[in-house]
Amino acid sequence: MHAKGLTAADLASYGISDVTEIVHNPDYDLLFKEETAPGLQGYERGTVTSLGAVAVDTGIFTGRSPKDKYLVRDDTTRDTVWWSDQGKGKNDNRPLSPEVWQHLKGLVTRQLSNKRLFVVDAYCGANPDSRLKVRFITEVAWQAHFVKNMFIRPEADELAGFEPDFIVMNGAKCTNPQWQAQGLNSENFVAFNLTERIQLIGGTWYGGEMKKGMFSIMNYLLPLKGIASMHCSANVGEQGDVAIFFGLSGTGKTTLSTDPKRRLIGDDEHGWDDDGVFNFEGGCYAKTIKLSADAEPDIYGAITRDALLENVTVRADGSVDFDDGSKTENTRVSYPIYHIKNIVKPVSKAGAAKKVIFLTADAFGVLPPVSRLTADQTQYHFLSGFTAKLAGTERGVTEPTPTFSACFGAAFLTLHPTQYAEVLVRRMQAAGAQAYLVNTGWNGSGKRISIKDTRAIIDAILNGDIDRVETFTLPIFNLAVPIELPGVNPAILDPRDTYANREQWQEKAQDLAQRFITNFDKYTDTPAGAALVHAGPRR
């Protein structure tokens, strides 16, 4: 699929000069040829696996670098962005001066000048009314492949007149030697300018910086229009019933929303407007550590030609060792969404959600595997966004550690969390949606709750069984927990029963409750936040 008309002069208008060749909107066959070319060195080189997918390495950057993320603070953003240096809540929106931005832009444009470049034009957002037209520019073939997988691929007639709303310039090979004098975190950078509508990447090869970069931008633009912007997966049943799954990386969004009984809308990033829920993306980005055909047949089956594996171990015979986490626990695969058979067609969108599921991976072993939330508890747990940071999704995280991430995606929020909560709750109330808290993490046995039990819990939520069974109230957290559910081991529903004695649970629960209370304090400086304190745990 080749759009016409992009010239060196067009790239010169972005500051990229003397381009030797533009490979514009390459098809998958050309990308395969380019990324596996014999002469490629280092991280540019792709390896063909026995599954047909190409595997690449991203070097030391096997996850995002949130401490290297910056937004230009200017008249556009000064009063709207949730800045890291303002208010109680910590976040990754570090302010950047226009002067330092110009320096970083010069570094990237010089890196891309005098080169053979890959340019991919794509959409972010399945709804034509709110989608972004994004132009990605890179000198690395597999990075072009990544964005072709992950974003929505325009039709030929749409490419013909493509005028980008946003430009992403990936200069992975360049770094910033002046970072210390400029007061930055390191020589690497992921920087955004909402006035110029450009993202710059330097120093990191991790493909997810392009994906999550555009998510951060949608998280800025959509809520200001009253559209919910959500870090969630979504699917739809045969009756048109939509469910959305919130959760941080590794909590099960992709796995649990990929269900043979339901059609997938998307696995990670969605909007919710007057027409319903819609995907931002045209692909999936699934974790592959310990992946097996038996446990996750849909994802395993999607790893064929045109899929792109990251940081996996490829054996000499071309087979992939999915159990090997020696490079990172955050091994990944990107693939176009149509590699999953059971998807919403022709456009990844459906109606309003009726079931809202908050996924948490509780490293403490305190929370029940499932509970039904009241309206106030829904807001409380959405703003709390409790989970465990799982090993490998960010640099430097090698052991599970408890964390609170507002809206189950604080790293990608560009506005204050309460703005996302307010928009989501309005959408839920209008649709009559019900929320549930599902723990995909650990219990008192020290083992992770089995995917078999978690899938049975999700089935009970989606088919309504959970709303028809008797519940008990779990103390301290005041959560309504079902006494039994079809297909779920009854011994795990009350987390207290998974400990040698209930006092052990009580002690851990009081510790975790205090962490919730301490974390939520940052929202009590607003009347809306203060009114929700009662919906949280009490020691």
Curated annotation (Swiss-Prot):
It is an enzyme of class 4 (lyase). InterPro entries: PEP_carboxykinase_ATP (IPR001272), PEP_carboxykinase_C (IPR013035), PEP_carboxykinase_N (IPR008210), PEPCK_ATP_CS (IPR015994). PROSITE patterns: PEPCK_ATP (PS00532). Pathway: Carbohydrate biosynthesis; gluconeogenesis. It is found in: Cytoplasm. It comes from the Bacteria. Its EC number is 4.1.1.49. One of its GO terms (biological process) is gluconeogenesis. Keywords: ATP-binding, Cytoplasm, Decarboxylase, Gluconeogenesis, Lyase, Manganese, Metal-binding, Nucleotide-binding. It catalyses: oxaloacetate + ATP = phosphoenolpyruvate + ADP + CO2. One of its GO terms (molecular function) is phosphoenolpyruvate carboxykinase (ATP) activity. CDD domains: PEPCK_ATP (cd00484). Binds 1 Mn(2+) ion per subunit. Substrate binds at residues 64, 206, 212, 332. GO terms for cellular component: cytosol. ATP binds at residues 212, 231, 247-255, 296, 332, 448-449, 454. Mn(2+) binds at residues 212, 231, 268. Disulfide bonds: none annotated. Its cofactor is Mn(2+). The keyword Chloroplast does not apply. Monomer. Belongs to the phosphoenolpyruvate carboxykinase (ATP) family. Involved in the gluconeogenesis. Catalyzes the conversion of oxaloacetate (OAA) to phosphoenolpyruvate (PEP) through direct phosphoryl transfer between the nucleoside triphosphate and OAA. This is Phosphoenolpyruvate carboxykinase (ATP). It comes from Edwardsiella ictaluri (strain 93-146). The lineage of its organism: Bacteria, Pseudomonadati, Pseudomonadota, Gammaproteobacteria, Enterobacterales. The gene is pckA.
